[in-house]
């Protein structure tokens, strides 16, 4: 089953959200 792909997607989303938050903090 696709548990691994799901967790990788979750981690990617979390990383992108963190990046967006960092960028907003810079602005």
From Swiss-Prot:
Any matching Pfam family: Hormone_2
SMART domains given in the database record: GLUCA
Molecular function GO labels: digestive hormone activity; hormone activity
GO cellular component terms given for this protein: extracellular space
Keyword Cell membrane appears in the UniProt entry: no
Highest taxon of source: Eukaryota
Subcellular location: Secreted
GO biological process: adenylate cyclase-activating G protein-coupled receptor signaling pathway; diet induced thermogenesis; hippocampus development; intracellular water homeostasis; negative regulation of gastrin-induced gastric acid secretion; positive regulation of lipid catabolic process; positive regulation of pancreatic juice secretion; positive regulation of somatostatin secretion
Modified residues (Valine amide): 27
Record's keyword terms, sorted: Amidation, Hormone, Secreted
UniProt function note: Hormone involved in different processes, such as regulation of the pH of the duodenal content, food intake and water homeostasis. Exerts its biological effects by binding to secretin receptor (SCTR), a G-protein coupled receptor expressed in the basolateral domain of several cells. Acts as a key gastrointestinal hormone by regulating the pH of the duodenal content.
Family statement drawn from the similarity comment of this UniProt entry: Belongs to the glucagon family.
Name the record gives this protein: Secretin
Annotated gene: SCT
């Amino acid at each position: 089953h696709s548990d691994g792909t799901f967790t990788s997607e979750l981690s990617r989303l979390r990383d992108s959200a963190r990046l967006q938050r960092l960028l907003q903090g810079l602005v």
